[in-house]
């Protein structure tokens, strides 16, 4: 059994599928690796009508796979070092779902930008032993509706000023001709309407409430955000229907060769997870224990290399 391409969907539909656990992550997937700049560039690309690479989903029908393999939810609140692991999800008794084989980084980035937060450490402060919001404050994605980015100081050809900001950051930036920060996730709370005129009406209502109804860039940008997230079917995807875990693993390895390179530890974890259902959880638990209880900063790579060495297998530094 092979697969097929399905009709493209909106970003809003994909976000709903993630929230309702219709999209899950298989244990062969690696961690979320994108940084804040990559997420902002993705949103700018969507706003500029740039194509988003196709997704690949695995429709999981086999009861044996549903019950014998671990699946995970998407990250909502990412915290550097302390909130990087996806929550495990029990699929027993769960309805239909698909596992994301290719496109995890993009979907997670969109989900965090629209429904979650991203926490990184403040500069010039020591790393805490546990998650401390005063040191790693949650940041939400905002879009500056007041003005575009300055092309003379913008090597990436970005147009839209997306930034992850804390509540304190937003409070410090008063609304003026250069600052009108809109929380991107709020676009999902706008009324669902069909006609273009109705969309513009709601955009003007919002801008009028913040004293920016006469700003043409703000009107065009907020309208563009609505269309990009809620109206345009920009996410193309392929559905793999095979229930052969070996075939799915091979597809995962091949499709990920073109994106962020798979590290040897990523590949080894994927292979292990295909036959040891909670390998990922056990390794992550050990990493967290060594970090929090013993005070050493290590990552999954070191643990995986140590495991290979202890089995007397060939290992490269």
Kindly give the residue locations of the regions a language model identified.
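Basic- and aromatic-enriched surface patches that contact anionic nucleotides/nucleic acids
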Residues: 2-33, 38-314
């Amino acid at each position: 059994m092979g697969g097929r391409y399905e009709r493209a969907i909106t970003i809003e539909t994909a976000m709903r599928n993630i929230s309702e656990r219709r999209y899950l992550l298989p244990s062969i997937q690696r961690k979320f690796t994108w940084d804040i700049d990559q997420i902002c560039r993705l949103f700018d690309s969507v706003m500029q009508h740039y194509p988003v690479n196709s997704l690949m989903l695995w429709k999981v029908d086999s009861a044996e796979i549903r019950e014998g393999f671990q699946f995970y939810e998407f990250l909502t609140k990412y915290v550097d070092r302390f909130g990087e692991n996806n929550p495990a999800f029990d699929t027993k008794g769960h309805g239909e779902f698909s596992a994301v084989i290719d496109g995890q980084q993009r979907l997670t980035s969109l989900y965090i930008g629209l429904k979650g937060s991203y926490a990184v450490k403040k500069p010039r402060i020591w790393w805490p032993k546990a998650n401390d919001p005063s040191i790693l404050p949650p940041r939400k994605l905002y879009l500056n509706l007041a003005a575009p980015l300055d092309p003379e100081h913008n090597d990436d050809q970005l147009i839209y000023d997306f930034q992850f900001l804390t509540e304190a950051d937003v409070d410090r930036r008063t609304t003026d001709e250069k600052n009108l920060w809109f929380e991107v996730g709020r676009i999902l709370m706008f009324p669902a309407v069909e006609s273009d005129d109705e969309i513009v009406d709601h955009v003007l209502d919002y801008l009028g409430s913040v004293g920016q109804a006469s700003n043409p860039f703000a009107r065009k940008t907020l309208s563009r955000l609505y269309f990009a997230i809620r109206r345009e079917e920009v996410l193309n995807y392929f559905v793999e229907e095979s229930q052969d875990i070996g075939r799915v693993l091979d597809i995962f390895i091949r499709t990920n060769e073109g994106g962020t390179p798979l590290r040897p530890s990523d590949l080894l974890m994927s292979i292990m997870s295909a036959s040891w259902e909670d390998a990922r959880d056990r390794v992550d638990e050990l990493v967290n224990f060594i970090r929090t209880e013993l005070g050493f900063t290590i990552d999954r790579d070191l643990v995986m290399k140590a495991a290979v060495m202890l089995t007397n297998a060939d290992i490269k530094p």
